[in-house]
């Protein structure tokens, strides 16, 4: 409906219009909180009795699945309707083992889906004594000091402890994608890259 209206208005007004998937770092919590105060029975993304929030833009509920390809199957049809602002965040519990694993995942997404933007978003922690630690560790495994855990809030990384209450609730409910158990049921990667003219293997991994 919105795509049709956008197209119609562009023809009528001879102007360009954009259908954008806007981020909602703070409003997803603020609006849900106000709605809950005014309409106590309204449904939000959180569980009953927990801090209310709405899912960001038109993303899937954060606890929908831990299979990245299941999520991509759903989001691909929707996100390609937007003309800007849309992105799929691949929330990973930890960093991938090496650049080849990251390249392989990007290659599969590029070959099998049409969505325009996606991120690989691992969680990491920072200890003031030992620096970078892969994954979520609220205490340093080496010295026991409290760390800062970083995750992508929407378009950028911030320490989780600095997120608003709604985003913290979202983080607690979020399922990270388990790549070891994610199944791509329609893999056309080899077919798409069959005629690749890259000069080196690493160029198209």
For each feature predicted by the language model, list its residue ranges:
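Single conserved hydrophobic/aromatic residue that forms the stacking wall/gate
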Residues: 1-12
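Short metal-coordination and nucleic-acid-contact micro-motifs, chiefly zinc-binding Cys/His arrays
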Residues: 120-125, 133-136, 146
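Phosphate-handling catalytic cores of nucleic-acid transaction enzymes
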Residues: 134, 144-149, 158-174
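Short cysteine-rich clusters marking metal-coordination/redox-active sites
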Residues: 127, 140-143
